[in-house]
Amino acid sequence: MIQAETQLNAADNSGAKRLYCIKVLGGTRKRYASVGDIIVVSVKEAIPNAKVKKGDVLKAVVVRTQKEVRRPDGSYIKFDDNSAVLINQAKEPIGTRIFGPVARELRAKQFMKIISLAPEVL
């Protein structure tokens, strides 16, 4: 459950380390983002000589949340951290690698490139 002002980890090799949620996209009443939702983020911490710099405002897709997500079969999945992957205007990841597992819910939201780059899909 991600909302405005939430800090997240970057789960890719775009160069960002910490992200800060500015806005949850999806209408005026959408307050919280879950796995697979797109958010607007600011890069709070980045490594030197990277694709993104500190202060950049980009879009990202949430891939892991500490708040559990209920699945249609009644099971729940939750992760140890809140993480997102930075994406461009075409909804393709900026980085070339994804770190850590990602949730299966991304497949239903058509983020196939992130699914294929991820080492594990839970």
UniProtKB/Swiss-Prot annotation:
Keyword field contains RNA-binding: yes
Keyword rRNA-binding appears in the UniProt entry: yes
Cellular component annotations (GO), alphabetically ordered: cytosolic large ribosomal subunit
Disulfide bonds listed in the record: none
Record's keyword terms, sorted: Ribonucleoprotein, Ribosomal protein, RNA-binding, rRNA-binding
InterPro entries: Ribosomal_uL14, Ribosomal_uL14_bac-type, Ribosomal_uL14_CS, Ribosomal_uL14_sf
Coiled-coil region(s): none
GO molecular-function term, one example from the UniProt record: large ribosomal subunit rRNA binding
GO annotation, biological process: translation
Family: Belongs to the universal ribosomal protein uL14 family.
Function, in words: Binds to 23S rRNA. Forms part of two intersubunit bridges in the 70S ribosome.
HAMAP family: Ribosomal_uL14
Self-association state and partner proteins as the record states: Part of the 50S ribosomal subunit. Forms a cluster with proteins L3 and L19. In the 70S ribosome, L14 and L19 interact and together make contacts with the 16S rRNA in bridges B5 and B8.
Protein name in UniProt: Large ribosomal subunit protein uL14
